[in-house]
C-alpha cells in the first residue's frame, strides 16, 4: 500500500478500535450526529465544542440559526466525536483541518473542558491539524491544555474593535485578549490576530490601533475576513452604534430575513492588509492558511493556493494516485500529478463529489477531472 491508501486504512482501523471500546448506545449516538456526515467548510471540518454563546456579539450569526445565549457543552463524549469523524466520508486522517469555534466560543466556562478534551482526542486518534478561534482570555490552563493536545495548534484571537464595547457586550476586553495572546506566544502557542468580521466604519478606522497593540505583544500574523449580515444582525449593529448606511451600500444582494448576505469589503481588506504588512505582519488570505502554516504543511487544494510555498510539497507520484483510486473503486484511464494538481482521466466526467473531495484532501492538491 502507498501512503495515501495508508491514510484511509488508518481511518478504518481507528473506527474498528473504537467500535470495540464504545457501547452500542455510544456508537448509535455518534452515527446519528452530524459530525459523521457533514462536509467540511473551506476552513476545515468545524468541530462543535458546545452550542450557544453568552458573549452576545452584535455581528454573530448563531442567534439567527436558532442558538441561544445560554451555552452548553456539546453532548458527545470525546471518543464518540472521534468515532463520528471516522464515519464521515469526507474526513482524511492527518489531512482534514479541524476548526473549533463556529457555533460557540470554545473557551467559555461551560465549554472549555469539552474543547480541550476534543482537541486532545481528535489529535491523538486522527491527527487532524487544530485551529481554534476565540475571544476568550488565554489562561495558563487553556494554553497548557491546547499544547498538550496539538502542540502546533493555530489559535486565532478575534479583535474587530477596541472602543465599541456595545458590539461585544459580554466578551472579554479586547486589549486583555491581546495581552493574553502575547503570554501564550511566549509559552509556545502559535497565535495569530483574527480581524474578522471587518465592520465597515468601525474596524477599518481602528485597524492601526489594533495592529499596534498586537505587534507590541509579539503577534506577527493576521487573518482578515469580511462581514455577513442578516436583517437582525444589521438591526443589532445599528443599535450598537454602527452606521447602517455603511453596511447597506456594500451588500452583495438585498437582505432576506435570516439569510446571511455578504458585505463587500475588498477595499477595506486591502487597506488593512497594507497596514499590517507595514507593521511586518504575515497576512494570511484565509483562516485555513494560518492552520497550514502553523503545522508546517504545503497546500494547493483551492484557488488561493499554493499556501506555505516555503515548505516542499509532500512527495506524490502517479503510482500513489493510482493505488488510491483503485482502493476507492474508481475506474480511470490515466492520471497526472504535479505539485499543484492531480488530473484524473475518465471515460465520463461524472465522479462522486465526495470522492473528488477525498482525493483533494488526501493529496493537498486540486483535483481536475478530464473526460478522455
Please give the residue ranges for each predicted region.
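N-terminal [4Fe-4S]-dependent radical SAM core
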Residues: 1-49, 62-74, 93, 334-339, ...
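Auxiliary Fe-S-binding modules of radical SAM enzymes
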Residues: 2-6, 208-372
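Intrinsically disordered, low-complexity boundary segments flanking structured domains
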Residues: 30-35, 84-89, 270-272
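Local cysteine-cluster metal-coordination motifs and their immediate loop/turn environment
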Residues: 46-66, 300-306
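Short, glycine/acidic-enriched capping/hinge loops at junctions between secondary-structure elements
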Residues: 59, 70-71, 110-112
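Short microdomains enriched in Cys/His and/or Lys/Arg
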Residues: 70-88, 320-329
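Conserved AdoMet/S-adenosylmethionine-binding subsite of the radical SAM
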Residues: 79-268
